[in-house]
């Protein structure tokens, strides 16, 4: 079944294009995960990002970031969607960006960690 969300469809196309053109295999992996049913998309709390992310790293969440937990590391978090509290907490110590912006800033996909 095709995706009915036009933003998600164009995001998947952009991810695949970035993976083909710049060789960033991480973007192809994220595109494959987003093509699966929505119930399998990641829902990641800030505590998990704090546990697994390194300083000055880009964390990609193929789904939604939720606001439970504390984030103290200076990381850039890229996701399809953020809860209101998650975006506020991330912006206090790091940067919350959309996946579209992450592809623009880093088309090769270097120093990226996918968390789900």
From Swiss-Prot:
Pfam families found in the cross-reference section: Ribosomal_L27A
Gene Ontology biological process terms in this record: translation
GO CC term (a single one): cytosolic large ribosomal subunit
Domain of life assignment: Archaea
GO MF entries: rRNA binding; structural constituent of ribosome
InterPro entries attached to this UniProt entry: Ribosomal_eL18, Ribosomal_eL18/eL18-A/B/_CS, Ribosomal_eL18_arc, Ribosomal_uL15/eL18, Ribosomal_uL15/eL18_sf, Ribosomal_uL15_CS
Coiled coil: none
Assembly with partners or alone: Part of the 50S ribosomal subunit. Interacts weakly with proteins L4 and L15. Has been cross-linked to L4.
HAMAP family xrefs: Ribosomal_eL18
Role played: Stabilizes the tertiary rRNA structure within the 23S rRNA domain (domain II) to which it binds.
Family: Belongs to the eukaryotic ribosomal protein eL18 family.
Record-given protein name: Large ribosomal subunit protein eL18
Organism, scientific name: Haloarcula marismortui (strain ATCC 43049 / DSM 3752 / JCM 8966 / VKM B-1809)
Lineage: Archaea, Methanobacteriati, Methanobacteriota, Stenosarchaea group, Halobacteria
